[in-house]
């Protein structure tokens, strides 16, 4: 009798696997970090073979720690860092180049060329995305143009492309299945999210052969089988990490919004079955493909959130441990007029300025370590407010609450300041591993382990609610200062 679902959670800095039981308890967790590769300024890569090795290793480890037999596993669900691009030889199964990570800016010149040709409007209207180096399409083109022999192999049908989910399914099934789901496809900048097919106009412009691309399916269905300790286990859930978190937060209704505070910060609002094109710098993406229906979401991606705390710790050496952030932030009553704009790799939504760079402004002789640490924390919340304000304007839906998850949502100071600055209650669930939980739910629903979405909604439990306490005058004053600081950071690297 199957009693468990295993979630594979392949992130930007680590590979994880979590075994969940029917009652959503985390029976075991295994995690392993892998190498971050920075060949040049603004370039970020991963070794796809190392991603596979670490991910399969922690999958086996989590099962072993839980003491679970393969026949007790109902299904495997996959959630993954999105946009990160792998191209491999379908005959050898070997990547022809390192995976180009979502954070990598090397393809900014390709994006500039697309804009010069006037393709940005077409791409926005059909993929829901803005033309940016963040997405997969230009990364595929770069690999084909710059790896010797790649273009010839691609034209012969010998190369395959995949986001990380596709790469993992290919490896788990022994090269039998080349597939992705709607949520991951919607992040490539080459997938038409209105017509639900790879977009031939964009493929032609980027010179990407259709033969490289995976089949696109629902986020909850049986894609293939993984061989786990001699038994075949269905792989039956796939969603990009942020869509998976929205699903794990039971964000099934129009207007439901969540913010995941990780390396970056990612806000998604469910907008239902109708496509809305943002007029305020957001992207439209596929929230989920479930039971043959597509739901859309508005998304704002903040490139640097938790990563700003790592920078304060590792580069400025103002912290010994990231866990100390809240302690220092609450030692002072405010930032003493300091703002930190962490535009280390440009600014994401709603600005989309590839050439913005980080800045620290408002420094006087009286500014100390705690002020700068607090400014770093507040920057995470300000960037989220930028996105949420744009969402409300686009959707016409007033936010009733914001559900939160991800590592930094455990920081009570940050959650209270987030509530204060958006003037909306912030809800933190008992289970904050919602990204992995979403993948588990999708996998479990496909095989009947859980019954339906209503059952999942009933399982969502609140741990703590944060309510706004700032006056309108104070809130506006703080936010005006932030907007001024953002202007200082823009267009810096031109």
Swiss-Prot record:
GO terms for molecular function: ATP binding; glycerol kinase activity. Sn-glycerol 3-phosphate binds at residues 12, 82-83, 134, 241. It comes from the Bacteria. The keyword Signal does not apply. Inhibited by fructose 1,6-bisphosphate (FBP). ADP binds at residues 12, 16, 263, 306, 407. It holds the Pfam family FGGY_N. InterPro entries: ATPase_NBD (IPR043129), Carb_kinase_FGGY (IPR000577), Carb_kinase_FGGY_CS (IPR018483), FGGY_C (IPR018485), FGGY_N (IPR018484), Glycerol_kin (IPR005999). Its EC number is 2.7.1.30. Key enzyme in the regulation of glycerol uptake and metabolism. Catalyzes the phosphorylation of glycerol to yield sn-glycerol 3-phosphate. This is Glycerol kinase.
